[in-house]
């Protein structure tokens, strides 16, 4: 557990690249004007075929890796040090990025579509609370505040065999950890069109929704819990990545042939299971090829 995981470093960089690539791709679709993106004059919704491959798991992967990173950092730090460090690496970038890049991106988009207004100079007042593209940093910080006090109970520092490590050693046992993710998908099914709470309408609607917050917490917690099982977790990833590859693409192609662009009509429990498999595919590929 004390060894540095180069695969997690690499996956963190890959996850950030995918976020940037996805947001760049949005500008080439017809969706761009509706979510305050500057739309390219030559847009083509055919790019959704590529974007939809990653759309169900790109954000959950970020939360999982953040949970893994928190647990690995806890091996060498006290809880107080963890609080201070997480405040420094999450809240400072969140505030700075929100009032600068976040506000600027909105001002540019609004100016592009509607023309300049002096009111845009005050957009930072909104973005510091909303976060815009950095909303996930706010969520991760809240998850840290919730879980750091309980890390001693969750983290299994002595690397003893637990019920979770036994499950990971079982053939197909890793799929049991998809249950909370699938249950959240079921919750989304039940509340997608609720007028009482902004739970979220589609699986990919992560930003500033109850769906995105709860799903992010589940993946963050799984990151802490599973990496605490030590080598058993990494060996499970190495052993099962081909299975995750097959199941993930099977779910994706089911979406492909059933109007995958419009996620509103699809069962979110299936999408959540697809997401689970692609995420563990990435973990498996990382454990096999990137931890060097």
PLM regions: where:
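Alpha-helical transmembrane segments and their immediate juxtamembrane cytosolic regions
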Residues: 1-292
